[in-house]
Amino acid sequence: MQGLYRRFRVLVLHPMAEKGNKMFKKILTATDLVTVCDASVLTAAQIAKQNNAKLQILHVLESASAVDRHLIKHFITGKDIVTSSDYEETVREEINKVYIEVLKPSVNYEIRVTPGFPWEEILRWTREEGTDLIVLGPHSARAEEKGVVRVVGKIGSTVEGVIMHENCPVLIVNSSIQKEILKFKRILVSIDFSKSCECALYFAVKLAQKYDSKLFSFHMIPVPPIPKYSKTEYEADTVMAKKRLKEFCHEFLSETDHEYIVWGGALPHLEILKCAEKKDVDLIAMGSHTKEEAGRWYAGSVVERVSFRSKCAVVVVTDPEVLLTWQDSLTEKIKTEKYMDRSIRVFTKK
């Protein structure tokens, strides 16, 4: 388990507290709403209250140009304007009006308004401040208004960009979550024996120790769609899988109330959601694996589909060894390459 300290940045820079103390010191959330509340901000605020943490609220101005990110749409009139410090302060004040009654006096918070690409600005602020947790919605709250087509089973480009470039845990919420559920008393960890999954498990254990929770380790056996796969074979595979699951998890779970769950299925995301509902969990923890398809990197279909459909919060952790590099160069590249269509984001290993 010592090797995990070298891989998991958030645990190296910000060691997790013992039970009863603060789990998080700095929590970042992002919203594209100005005049109404966003579920991700309300959820982040509740977690900040529980941990006496600083809350960082980010709003990235909607751009009217793929070339110049300072050319934006006015949040009231919708007209194209060039942003300025005065305009950004006006937007910040409007956002503050929406949340001031919810946040004060119990939450120490900061609101930042800036032009740019949302996922890049999230990464920038996260790394400037050493953020412990990022809270996001699976899609833009204004996706339909912006003309963005939501693909069933897919998370938005902002969440995807953050997950692929940052191993700070990302909490994905589909709606505002009740305060009681945010105590994270029943946590499900999806286990596929990967390094990212190991990071997610370690993070989930620290949460369980903080909140005195029960942790469920779940593994799905892929069931081949052939008639020759007998009940005897399935039972033997189940025994072997549970043994492997215990060997993988036991070092992490020795001081945590836990249960091992193994069953067969064809689609991992459906079985994870089924297990979450059956065990009435209030958090699903997953490891993310960046993948490449036709020149484009993405976060992994199981993570996407679970995050998109889950009724409870989903926390995603990515192994640092599979993160894509980001050196804050993409924005400048797009400014200079005016022919580039920003709706197609191509990443390389360089």
Residue ranges and their predicted role:
Residues Q2-Y5, H14:
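Low-complexity, intrinsically disordered or signal/transmembrane-proximal segments
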Residues R9-P15, G20-K22, Q46, Q50, ...:
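Gly/Ser-rich helix-loop-strand patches that form or flank binding pockets
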Residues A17-T77, S106, K185-E235, H250-S254, ...:
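Small/aliphatic-rich secondary-structure junction motif
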Residues V36, R142-E144, S196, P268, ...:
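Short glycine-rich, flexible loops that bind phosphorylated cofactors or substrates
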Residues S40, D68, K146-G147, K183, ...:
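Short, well-ordered secondary-structure micro-motifs
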Residues T77-E93, E233-K242:
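A short acidic, glycine-rich active-site loop
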Residues Y109-I111, H258-I261:
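Rossmann-fold cofactor-recognition segment
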Residues V113-I122, W263-E271:
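Charged docking surfaces used in two-component/phosphorelay signaling
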